[in-house]
């Protein structure tokens, strides 16, 4: 068994690939796949967003190369940004 960090990294990879490739490129998330990932894995994030267009905005911000899909590198940017934003909350409540 790996360290906590190795396990966390493996989980991030597995979550991405569990949602990618259901339609189109198996190494990227379509808008529909990104929405499904956010709804199942980050439902608290979506619940906190009062904006009905939250997924569209997230997709636009993440899709750095403008191909209409989110690749693994772009997905990691989302996870890292959310982790930074949540750091104080989790640290203070642990």
Swiss-Prot record:
Query: What does the record say about tissue specificity?
Result: Although predominant among the water-soluble brain proteins, S100 is also found in a variety of other tissues.
S-nitrosocysteine PTM sites in chain numbering: 86
Q: Name one Pfam family in it.
A: S_100
GO MF annotation list:
ATPase binding; calcium ion binding; calcium-dependent protein binding; protein homodimerization activity; S100 protein binding
One Gene Ontology term of the biological-process aspect is:
regulation of heart contraction
Enumerate the residues binding Ca(2+) 2: 63, 65, 67, 69, 74
| Principal localisation | cytoplasm
- What cellular component GO annotations does this protein have? cytoplasm; cytosol; Golgi apparatus; mitochondrion; nucleoplasm; sarcoplasmic reticulum
Q: Which InterPro entries match?
A: EF-hand-dom_pair, EF_Hand_1_Ca_BS, EF_hand_dom, S100-A1, S100/CaBP7/8-like_CS, S100_Ca-bd_sub
Q: Which domain of life does the protein's organism represent? A: Eukaryota
Kindly state the subunit structure of this protein: Dimer of either two alpha chains, or two beta chains, or one alpha and one beta chain. Also forms heterodimers with S100P. Interacts with AGER. Interacts with CAPZA1. Interacts with FKBP4. Interacts with RYR1 and RYR2. Interacts with CACYBP in a calcium-dependent manner. Interacts with PPP5C (via TPR repeats); the interaction is calcium-dependent and modulates PPP5C activity. Interacts with ATP2A2 and PLN in a Ca(2+)-dependent manner. Interacts with mitochondrial F1-ATPase subunits ATP5F1A and ATP5F1B; these interactions increase F1-ATPase activity.
Q: What function does the entry list? A: Small calcium binding protein that plays important roles in several biological processes such as Ca(2+) homeostasis, chondrocyte biology and cardiomyocyte regulation. In response to an increase in intracellular Ca(2+) levels, binds calcium which triggers conformational changes. These changes allow interactions with specific target proteins and modulate their activity.
This chain belongs to the protein called Protein S100-A1
- Species this chain originates from: Bos taurus (Bovine)
Q: Which gene encodes it?
A: S100A1
